[in-house]
Amino acid sequence: MLTPKKVKFRKRQKGRLKGDALKGNNVAFGEIGLKVLEHGKLTSQQIEAARVAAMRHIKRGGKMWIRIFPDQPYTAKPLETRQGKGKGAPVGWYAPVKPGRVLYEIKGVNLELAREALTRAAHKLPVKTTIVVREGL
């Protein structure tokens, strides 16, 4: 799983996502990518599950880039606990994503195989996505 090595604060306020992605919204490394169409929070488990699904489809060919990193902690209170008594303990990490952000990129395999691999990865994610091809190909 993806986790930060060191953070300044253990817990964080939820906040709110507004607007579109200003950076990371173009295919930069690969030939084809998976782009988000709505706001969302992707946990490290979801990011890894999508990566595994795509890599199993393309097998040994090609290279894949993950363009997001889960650096925000999320907390949970124990089961059967009443409300109050402070914020729960950190249980995992998530990456906030805005519309337009490219999540994964693939290079080195034919476009149909890469398109199918990214479709399989998209099924593992809780947000709507689309497949984009790098301009000039």
Swiss-Prot record:
Top-rank lineage group of the source organism: Bacteria
Keywords associated with the record: Ribonucleoprotein, Ribosomal protein, RNA-binding, rRNA-binding, tRNA-binding
Transferase keyword on record: no
InterPro entries given in the database record: Ribosomal_uL16, Ribosomal_uL16_bact-type, Ribosomal_uL16_CS, Ribosomal_uL16_dom, Ribosomal_uL16_sf
GO biological process, one term: translation
UniProt-listed CDD domains: Ribosomal_L16_L10e
GO cellular component terms listed in the entry, alphabetical order: cytosolic large ribosomal subunit
GO molecular function, one term: structural constituent of ribosome
Keyword Zinc: no
Stored Gene3D superfamilies: Ribosomal protein L10e/L16
UniProt-listed PANTHER family: 50S/60S RIBOSOMAL PROTEIN L16, LARGE RIBOSOMAL SUBUNIT PROTEIN UL16M
Function, in words: Binds 23S rRNA and is also seen to make contacts with the A and possibly P site tRNAs.
Quaternary assembly: Part of the 50S ribosomal subunit.
Family: Belongs to the universal ribosomal protein uL16 family.
Protein name: Large ribosomal subunit protein uL16
Source organism of the structure: Oleidesulfovibrio alaskensis (strain ATCC BAA-1058 / DSM 17464 / G20)
Species lineage: Bacteria, Pseudomonadati, Thermodesulfobacteriota, Desulfovibrionia, Desulfovibrionales
Gene field: rplP
